[in-house]
Regions:
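Active-site-lining helix/loop region of Rossmann-like oxidoreductase modules
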Residues: 9, 13, 151-285, 312, ...
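A short hydrophobic/small-residue beta-strand
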Residues: 99-101
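Adenosine-phosphate binding glycine-rich loop
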Residues: 128-156, 311, 319
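N-terminal glycine-/serine-/threonine-rich beta1-alpha1-beta2 phosphate-ribose binding loop
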Residues: 1-96
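Gly/Ser/Thr-rich loops at beta-strand to alpha-helix junctions
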Residues: 12-14, 82-83, 107-112, 136-143, ...
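Rossmann-fold NAD(P)-binding glycine/threonine-rich loop
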Residues: 86, 105-130
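Predominant activation on well-ordered alpha-helical scaffold segments within soluble catalytic domains
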Residues: 19-20, 122, 143-150, 217-225, ...
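C-terminal helical cap and adjacent loop that interface with cofactors, partners, or active-site loops
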Residues: 285-352
Length: 352
C-alpha cells in the first residue's frame, strides 16, 4: 500500500488528533472542510497546532469538487453523531468512490437504526467500489475487547457493560444529543419520551428514518454481528443525569444549573435467539470535578469475567482507532461495511 492521501471532514476538537495521528502515521492530508467560518480559509496547522502544512480549510459545500480535484484514498469524517446528519457528506464520498470512516456513533452499526440510509450508502459504495464505515473508541472498548473476552468463555448467558464519558470532550452536537443543559421537564419531553413507545412504534420510526438511537443501540447490534448472534428484541431507556451544584459547560457556553440535566444514561437491552442477553449502558454528561471516564464489562457464564478500564483517554483512543482502521477500510470489500466484518482492531504503522 502506497502513501495514503486523506481529506479531513470537520475541523473541530476531534480533528486535532485525527489529522495529527494520520500525518504522523505516514499519511498525506490533501484537503479539509468545515462549516465554521472561524476556521475556513485557514491552514489546517491552525487546528492541529503545528507548522504550516499547506492545506487550506474549505467550506463543506465545496466537498464534492474537492474530492474530484484531489482524489483522496479516504475521508476522515469527525462531525455529527447521527446518520441523518451525515447522510449528505457520506453520500458525497460514496458517489465519488472515496472510502470514508467516521466517528459518528450511529455509524458503528447503523443497519439497526437507519436501514434506509445504510442501504442506500451500501448500494452507491458498491457501484463506485469504495467502503463506508464507522469506528472510534467503541471499536475497541465496547466491541473487540468484549468479543475477545467472549472467545475465552465456555458458556455465555449475559454480557453487561457500562461506559461513561465527558460530553465536553466531543463538541456541541454530542452534548445536545445527550440533553445536557435541559431542565428535567425539557429532558423528559425532548429525550426520554421518545423511548416510551411500543415495539411497533419504534420499528416504524426506524423504517421511516426517524429513530434517534443511543450509542449502545448500535453497539449491541455490532456485538451481535461480530458474535454471530440473532437479535429478537431490543429496547432502550434514557434517564437524565444531574448534579447538586451548578456546572459550567464550555462546549455549550452555559452554566448547567443544579438539578438540571448534565447529560444522560442510556440503557439498551438486547435478547437473542441464542439465549444470550446483552445489556449495555452509556453515561454521557458534563463532568463535575470528581468525575472520570470508566469502562466496565462483564461476560456472565462459565466463567464470569469482568474487566474495568479507569480513566481511559477516550478522545485520543477514539482518534487513534479511526486512524488505525484506515488500512482496513481501504482493503475491505465495497459497500457499507461495519468494522465487525473487518477483523480485529490493531496497531498499524505505515512506512513513510
Amino acid at each position: 500500500m502506497g502513501k495514503i492521501k486523506f481529506v479531513q471532514v470537520g475541523c473541530g476538537k476531534m480533528s486535532i488528533y485525527t489529522m495529527r495521528y494520520a500525518i504522523e502515521n505516514g499519511m498525506e492530508i490533501v484537503g479539509a472542510v468545515d462549516i465554521n467560518p472561524d476556521v475556513i480559509g485557514k491552514d489546517v496547522s491552525s487546528v492541529i497546532g503545528c507548522e504550516e502544512v499547506g492545506v487550506t480549510i474549505k467550506n463543506v459545500t465545496e466537498l464534492d469538487s474537492l474530492l474530484k480535484e484531489v482524489k483522496p484514498d479516504v475521508a476522515i469524517v469527525t462531525t455529527m453523531s447521527l446518520m441523518n446528519d451525515l447522510e449528505e457528506v457520506l453520500m458525497t464520498c460514496a458517489k465519488n468512490g472515496v472510502n470514508a470512516i467516521t466517528t459518528c456513533e450511529e455509524a458503528f452499526y447503523p443497519a439497526n437504526s437507519s436501514p434506509r440510509i445504510t442501504s442506500e450508502l451500501d448500494r452507491v459504495a458498491k457501484e463506485t467500489n469504495c467502503t463506508i464505515t464507522g469506528s472510534g473508541y467503541q471499536d475497541a472498548f465496547w466491541g473487540n475487547l468484549i468479543t475477545t473476552l467472549a472467545g475465552a468463555t465456555h458458556n455465555i448467558t449475559k454480557i453487561k457493560g457500562s461506559s461513561s464519558y465527558n460530553v465536553e470532550d466531543y463538541g456541541i452536537a454530542l452534548a445536545k444529543a445527550h440533553g445536557a443543559g435541559l431542565t428535567l421537564e425539557e429532558f423528559d419531553k425532548e429525550v426520554a419520551s421518545a423511548d416510551r413507545i411500543s415495539v411497533e412504534e419504534r420499528n416504524k420510526l426506524i423504517e421511516n428514518g426517524e429513530f434517534a438511537p443511543s450509542y449502545m443501540w448500535n453497539t449491541n447490534g455490532w456485538l451481535c454481528d461480530k458474535l454471530g448472534l440473532t437479535p429478537i428484541s431490543q429496547i432502550q431507556k434514557c434517564v437524565p443525569m444531574t448534579h447538586n451544584e451548578d456546572i459550567y459547560s464550555s462546549t455549550l457556553n452555559m452554566t448547567v444549573k443544579a438539578g438540571d440535566a448534565t447529560g444522560m444514561s442510556a440503557v439498551v437491552t438486547t435478547e437473542t435467539k441464542e439465549g444470550i442477553t446483552i445489556e449495555s449502558e452509556c453515561i454521557g454528561k458534563v463532568y463535575a470535578e470528581t468525575d472520570c471516564d470508566t469502562n466496565e464489562w462483564t461476560v456472565y457464564g462459565e466463567p464470569d469475567t469482568t474487566f474495568v478500564v479507569t480513566r481511559p483517554n477516550t478522545v485520543e483512543l477514539t482518534c487513534a482507532s479511526i486512524v488505525n482502521r484506515i488500512p482496513d477500510v481501504i482493503s475491505a470489500k465495497a459497500g457499507y461495511v461495519p468494522t465487525s466484518q473487518m477483523g480485529e482492531l490493531k496497531y498499524q504503522k505505515m512506512a513513510e
